[in-house]
Each structure stands twice: as C-alpha cells, then as structure tokens.
Regions:
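Accessory nucleic-acid engagement/destabilization modules that flank
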Residues: 1-156
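Conserved adenine-nucleotide phosphate-binding loops and their immediately adjacent elements
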Residues: 159-168
Length: 168
C-alpha cells in the first residue's frame, strides 16, 4: 500500500499566490527520487460539458457556474510549483497532479475526449475509481519521507525557473 510515513499537506497555500492545493502527498519513487502527488478534491456530483477549453459547468454557490476542469486546475498547481519553486527545480522533484471527485458516479463528462489533453497531464478519478486513485499514488510514491519533501517545498525560495525565464 501507500507507505505509513508518507508526507501529507492539506490545503497548502502556494506562496505569493491565493491558490490552495487541497492535498499534497510526498515521498519518493522506486528510484528514490523525491516526488509529490497533488490531489484536487471536488465534492461535485454532476458536471456539464462546454465547448470551451478546460471549462466545465457545475452547480456551485446556488447556481450553475463555468469553472476550470479539475484536471486542468491540478495541472496548473503543479506547473506553478515547477515554474516558481526553487527546491522543486534544483532537486528535480517530480510533481504528479490528479483530481478526485468523490461524489461523482458518472464519468462521461469529466473524462470526455474534449478534455483529453488535460486528463493526460492530470487524470480525474470518480467515486468508483478509489482503487485507480490509490494505484496512481502508489505508482509515484513507493517510499515515505516523514514530510521531508513537503518541508523542503514549503521553505523554498520562490523564483522563476530558467526554463520559464528563457520563454519570457
């Protein structure tokens, strides 16, 4: 299973942003390489397809709203850490995003081919996918780290990566 001494951070605020990552699980992979799994948690039970890239409709705050697809959201959090967290860059920490919609029973819309590009970067798991979610976590985290990777990420300096700076 998932190691008992795996690091866990709940509602982690990405420094110098208003973004919060619902769940981060840390450890190392089979090659002892530091890794983190980002899990975007959604309570949604239903979503509707839109023609817009990375956008779904769901019932939120008393009405139907257009919101980011959770896979896209999880991937953007991973990209923020990869692009601006010095420790993630220098220690080459692997960031593996996914989304878990624990109340959703029908996957037709959330896993629709319209969102394929985002699902490939960060898979979405629904209520019946708990075993697949566990397998995803175990695939990336074979050994626990007693929170060491999360501690390193949290105390890291924030600066643009060379890759990002080269693009600008």
């Amino acid at each position: 299973g998932i190691p008992d001494d795996t690091g866990v951070a709940i509602e982690y605020r990405i420094p110098q942003t208003s973004k919060r990552i619902d769940l981060i699980i840390t450890g190392s992979d089979e090659n002892k390489k530091s890794t983190a799994v980002i899990v975007e948690l959604k309570q949604w039970s239903d979503v509707k397809l839109t023609s817009k890239d990375a956008i779904v409709k769901t019932y939120l705050g008393g009405g139907e709203r257009e919101v980011n697809h959770p896979s896209y959201q999880a991937w953007t959090y991973a990209a923020l850490l990869e692009d601006f967290n010095e420790v993630v860059q220098e220690q080459n920490i692997a960031i593996n995003p996914c989304a878990y919609l624990h109340n959703m029973v029908n996957e037709d819309v959330i896993k629709h081919s319209h969102y394929q590009e985002h699902l490939e970067k960060a898979p979405s798991f629904i209520k019946s996918d708990t075993e697949k979610l566990t397998d995803f976590i175990k695939q990336h985290i074979r050994f626990g780290d007693a929170g060491k990777v999360m501690f390193e990420i949290d105390k890291s300096k924030i600066r643009p990566s060379k890759n990002l700076a080269d693009k600008l």
